[in-house]
Each structure stands twice: as structure tokens, then as C-alpha cells.
Amino acid sequence: MKLLIFICLAAVALARPKPPLRHQEHLQNEPDSREELFKERKFLRFPEVPLLSQFRQEIINELNRNHGMEGHEQRGSSSSSSEEVVGNSAEQKHVQKEEDVPSQSYLGHLQGLNKYKLRQLEAIHDQELHRTNEDKHTQQGEPMKGVNQEQAYFYFEPLHQFYQLDAYPYATWYYPPQYIAHPLFTNIPQPTAPEKGGKTEIMPQW
């Protein structure tokens, strides 16, 4: 078994390609030559493809150059003569007006939204103020103020809080309320009697 393993290892060692013999100068520059060979092989196999970000950067640079050249041309044309300045400024104003029409309508829309939001915020602020005032009155034991019909939609009267000892006179919180809610008597049905009956007692149906 050991002999078989030894023969396999010897065959593998003999089958490996041997590097060619080089001069001493080549041995000193060996790492550089390997790197160069690797770069050449990589270049031949996988040509470098410019990335999408590089394309974007080039396009942005070209646009900036074109914009800069247009700015220089406009400065040169404006300094050439006053008549051209008046013509260019009129054309620019006309172009700006055309461009500003949608933006002005958009700004008007935004201002309307801002006014609407301000009204909402003011209404919310008024509601909070009213609630805090109501809470103060209930805590101090003062009578409640009347509520407008508009405000009644938003507010509910707070229930009496019996657990606050300071808000009520001594020992009134201890006793249960004297007023008990009774059912209404308007829901009692009408008494019924037989049509042919003489002097019979009428019994209500509950």
C-alpha cells in the first residue's frame, strides 16, 4: 500500500510542468513579469468595460462644459452692444414668463394649502385652549360655561370626578348620588279592553 502511494506521488511530481530556466536578471524581475503577464492575460480575456457611473460622470461633465460655454457666450453677446442686451433681456423675460407660468400656479396652489393648514392649526389650537379651560374649571369646582353649538360638535362635557377631594366640599364625595335615573313612563302601552265587554276591569299589558 505504501509502495502504491509512493508511485502515485512520484508520477504526479514528474507530470508537473517544469518552469524554463532563466537567467539571473530574469529571476530578479520575476514578480514584475508575473504581474505584467497577468495584466496582459486579463486584458485579452476580459476587456475593460466602462461602468455606468463613469458614463454618468462623463455626461455630467459635458453638460457642465456646455452650460459654461453658453454662459460665456451670453456674457460676450451682452457686452457687445446695448441693443442686443435689450433684445436678449426681452427674450429672456419672455422665456422666463413662459417657464414661470406653471411654477406660479404651483406656488399659488401651495399658498392656498398653507392657508388651509393654518386655519386647521388655529382651529386645533382653539380646541385645545377650550379643553384646558374646561379642565381647569372642573378641577377648581367652578360651574361650567355654556358651549356654542359650533363647539358642541367637537367637545363633550367631562364627567364629575369624585376622586378629587379638593374639588368638592368636605364629605360630599363620600356619599353616593341622591338622584337615581328612573325609566320613562311614556313607553307604557295603551290599555286594551274587549269591545263587547260590559263592566270589566281594564288591566294594562306590561
Curated annotation (Swiss-Prot):
Q: Which gene encodes it?
A: CSN1S1
- One Pfam family of this protein, by short name? Casein
Identification of the protein by name: Alpha-S1-casein
Q: Which UniProt keywords apply?
A: Milk protein, Phosphoprotein, Secreted, Signal
Q: Which domain of life does the UniProt lineage start with?
A: Eukaryota
Biological role stated in the UniProt entry: Important role in the capacity of milk to transport calcium phosphate.
Q: In which tissues is it expressed?
A: Mammary gland specific. Secreted in milk.
UniProt keyword ATP-binding, yes or no: no
Listed PANTHER family: ALPHA-S1-CASEIN (PTHR10240:SF0)
Query: From which source organism is this entry?
Result: Sus scrofa
Q: Where is this region: Disordered?
A: 67-106
Localization annotation: Secreted
